[in-house]
């Protein structure tokens, strides 16, 4: 089968490609590299010109005066120049409703070319989209990245990208995709729950994790327990990082001789991996039902991760033992759980083994790729 994967989000499509290739399928991945993370692709449409001093200044002026983004335009043009390579695929999968991330009119023009020149096209819900945002706004108690905004509307500027999914221009893109794709697949519980009952929703397939590359090792605790917090200022509020920071202030004072804290900010993917390889405990996010990609890779390596692990997640996978700590936007709760682990290192080792076994069973990249093939072939 010839498969085209368009867009990247936290290494998901890269891992899926690796699994599909293990099954002897021909796979092409094209993306912008997912911003500063610089994920690899067969065909990159990363904007470069706008990084130059003159064009960066011009971009800022145009954004401020006319809300026109030169970077989006460049991204679209670069994708257009690559479209000669994107023909006659058996399956195309788009990640999110804006996989190209150009201007809405240009996005639809490019997507129409993809639909007309290929066979089956599916949409993967692995991030914010119109259906997801609509659901969150109607269900404000739903654990989501928008909760900080609901509590403090002054944070709106940090959520502008979320609300672009509700503007009229994007809604046209949403309707086009919704009417023309063969189905919508969810990558985890956070995207499945808003899709329940939707006629286009065809199933949840867990994020693929390339366990062969990660080389999991038995966790060893020698002198100090190492806690890692990675900070990306672009999603600082959405991940609830401030709750972790406040908890760590207390933990650092209480257990000064028992712990080491690593805080890494805005690192490219490869550097981020090197830093967190040293840790026993990884602090990921507090506003989620399920694990995102960073959490899954850490769990595959046997880290104890504070992330989404709500009851809905445990019920879906029929878990009887904890594979991660369900993080909540509650500093006292986080302190309590961190303290318990620091004082009971045997529980760290036990959960480490549970996490590795869970990833092997539910997220192994080849098994997940097989599930995609089976689902695509139904349509």
Model regions: which residues?
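Short N-terminal targeting/anchoring amphipathic segment
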Residues: 2-6, 82-105, 120-123, 281
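A charged, aromatic-enriched C-terminal amphipathic alpha-helix characteristic of glycosyltransferases
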Residues: 346-377
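A short, active-site helix/loop in glycosyltransferases that binds the activated sugar's phosphate group
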Residues: 132-133, 161-202
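Acceptor-binding helix/loop patch of EC 2.4 sugar-transfer enzymes
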Residues: 123-166, 234, 310, 315-317
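Aromatic "clamp/platform" in nucleotide-sugar-dependent glycosyltransferases that forms part
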Residues: 286-287
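Conserved donor-binding/catalytic core segment of Leloir-type glycosyltransferases
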Residues: 203-239, 245-248
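Short hydrophobic beta-strand element within catalytic cores of glycosyltransferases
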Residues: 304-309
């Amino acid at each position: 089968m010839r498969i085209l994967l368009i867009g990247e989000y936290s290494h998901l499509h890269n891992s899926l490609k690796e699994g599909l290739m293990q099954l002897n399928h021909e796979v092409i991945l094209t993306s912008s590299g997912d911003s500063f993370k610089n994920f690899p692709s067969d065909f990159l449409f990363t904007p470069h010109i706008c990084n130059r001093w003159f064009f960066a200044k011009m971009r800022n002026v145009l954004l401020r005066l006319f809300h026109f983004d030169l970077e989006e335009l460049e991204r679209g043009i670069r994708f257009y120049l690559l479209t000669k390579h994107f023909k006659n695929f058996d399956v195309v999968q788009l990640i999110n409703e804006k996989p190209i991330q150009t201007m809405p009119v240009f996005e639809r023009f490019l997507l129409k070319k993809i639909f007309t020149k290929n066979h089956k096209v599916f949409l993967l819900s692995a991030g914010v989209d119109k259906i997801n945002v609509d659901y969150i706004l109607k269900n404000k108690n739903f654990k989501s990245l928008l909760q900080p905004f609901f509590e403090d509307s002054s944070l709106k500027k940090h959520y502008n990208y979320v609300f672009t999914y509700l503007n009229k221009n994007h809604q046209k893109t949403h309707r086009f995709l919704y009417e023309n794709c063969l189905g919508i697949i969810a990558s985890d519980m956070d995207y499945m729950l808003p899709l329940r009952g939707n006629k286009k929703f065809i199933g949840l397939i867990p994020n693929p994790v390339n366990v062969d590359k990660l080389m999991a090792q038995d966790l060893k605790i020698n002198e100090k327990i190492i806690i890692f917090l990675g900070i990306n200022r672009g999603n600082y509020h959405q991940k609830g990082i401030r709750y972790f920071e406040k908890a760590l202030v207390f933990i650092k004072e209480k257990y000064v001789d028992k712990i080491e804290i690593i805080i890494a900010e805005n690192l490219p993917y490869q550097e981020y991996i090197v830093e967190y390889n040293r840790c026993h405990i990884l602090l990921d996010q507090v506003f989620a039902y399920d694990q995102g990609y960073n959490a899954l890779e850490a769990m595959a390596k046997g880290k104890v991760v504070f992330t989404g692990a709500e009851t809905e997640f445990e019920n879906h996978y029929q878990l009887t033992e904890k594979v991660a700590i369900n993080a909540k936007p509650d500093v006292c709760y986080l302190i309590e759980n961190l303290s318990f682990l620091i004082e009971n290192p045997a529980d760290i080792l036990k959960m480490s083994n549970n996490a590795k076994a869970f990833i092997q069973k539910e997220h192994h990249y080849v098994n997940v790729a097989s599930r995609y093939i089976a689902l695509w072939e139904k349509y």
